[in-house]
Amino acid sequence: MDKTTFQNPDIVKFINEKFYAVKLDSERKTDITTPEKVYKYVKGVGKERGYHEMAAALTMGRLITLPSTVFLDETFRVLQPIPGYKNPETFEMIMTFYGDNHYKRTLFTLYQKSYVPLEQLKLKLISE
């Protein structure tokens, strides 16, 4: 996603305007301290890979799929972990659902039906 989705200028602009973007290595070996807790690296057993407790907490204890994107609200409550690669078109729809607070008013399945890509919105504004 670093080479595709996160190179899209519309996505970069929207993320910078609406979110605090943080990249976390799910296998980071150093502690991360928050006011509530110290998150640590958990070593894998045998051939299993280790993981960081913060990555597990953010994905709500689910198996960590790489890459994963997690959206949090203003109070740092996990709204939704999004597992796996998302192309720019799909990611844009997901990020605007959360970034413009549509999740507070509608289900994602309904939002998908009425979604207008940012590029189309820009063209509409230019033509008006």
Predicted segments with their positions:
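Thiol-/selenol-based redox modules, centered on thioredoxin-like
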Residues: 78-128
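Conserved redox-active cysteine motifs that mediate thiol-disulfide chemistry
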Residues: 1-6
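Thioredoxin-like thiol-disulfide oxidoreductase module
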Residues: 9-80, 88, 93-100
